[in-house]
């Protein structure tokens, strides 16, 4: 709990799961009995959200150079100096929800609750 200008502001933990069903199970296990919002669940001291699987993907080669749109053995290997990423169209809305929650002033601790394997870690890392 934090005091600001005579008001009590509750600091919150943010839990980020890989998908909605896992987020609901985490919320149940952690006794987060808050209201369900659009893309997250919030209680007095916690927020639970999810990624819906991958929210971000690597850009296709033609984003780096239009000549790479047509596949050719001559252009391999293709190793950019810096990788480019883009949001996946179907889940842009959820990406922006997670982004907004990550940047809230009242969020003081972030728990990554994606799968423990390589893929789960990668899903969160790109967010």
Region annotations inferred by a language model:
Residues 2-127:
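Intrinsically disordered, low-complexity regulatory segments
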């Amino acid at each position: 709990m934090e005091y600001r200008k005579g008001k009590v502001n509750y600091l919150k933990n943010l839990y980020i799961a890989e998908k909605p069903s896992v987020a609901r199970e985490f919320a149940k296990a952690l006794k987060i009995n808050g209201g369900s919002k659009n893309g997250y669940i919030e209680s007095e001291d916690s927020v639970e959200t999810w990624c819906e699987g991958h929210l971000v993907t690597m850009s296709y080669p033609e984003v780096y150079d239009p000549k790479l749109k047509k596949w050719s053995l001559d252009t391999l290997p293709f190793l950019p100096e810096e990788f480019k990423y883009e949001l996946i169209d179907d889940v842009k809305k959820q990406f922006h929800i997670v982004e907004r929650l990550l940047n809230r002033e009242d969020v003081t601790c972030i728990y990554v609750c994606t799968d423990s394997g390589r893929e789960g870690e990668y899903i969160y890392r790109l967010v």
